[in-house]
Amino acid sequence: MNSINRMTLYKLIWCRIRFWQNMQDISDQELADSLQVAKRTLKDYDRNAKNITLEKLDHFLSVNSLKLKDLSYYSHSNPR
């Protein structure tokens, strides 16, 4: 059986949050505040995002008036 390298859901979500941050020109401190974490925690998430919680994600989405689908690459490039 072939082994498939797949990206974990938490890593995918974190990558999309970082992409959104870059596109919106948001500072690390502003991002940390919207996730209710310390700024250094962002670097921990960069290494391994498995500790990001749904509570943190929900707060981030709420503060920024986003929906989960807004973080999706496909929602911008291939609307349905």
Task: Give names to the regions the model predicted.
Residues N22, D33, S62:
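Alpha-helical residues within the helix-turn-helix
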Residues M1-M7, S72-R80:
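Short, charged recognition helix plus adjacent turn
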Residues R18, N22, Q36, R47-A49, ...:
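Residue-level detection of the helix-turn-helix DNA-binding "recognition helix"
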Residues E55-D70:
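DNA major-groove recognition helix of helix-turn-helix/homeodomain DNA-binding modules
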Residues D25-D44:
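Short alpha-helical DNA-recognition segment
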Residues M1-Q24:
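A short, Lys/Arg-rich alpha-helix, primarily the initiator
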Residues C15, D25-I26, I52-E55:
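Residue-level signal for the short linker/turn that defines the boundary of a DNA-recognition helix
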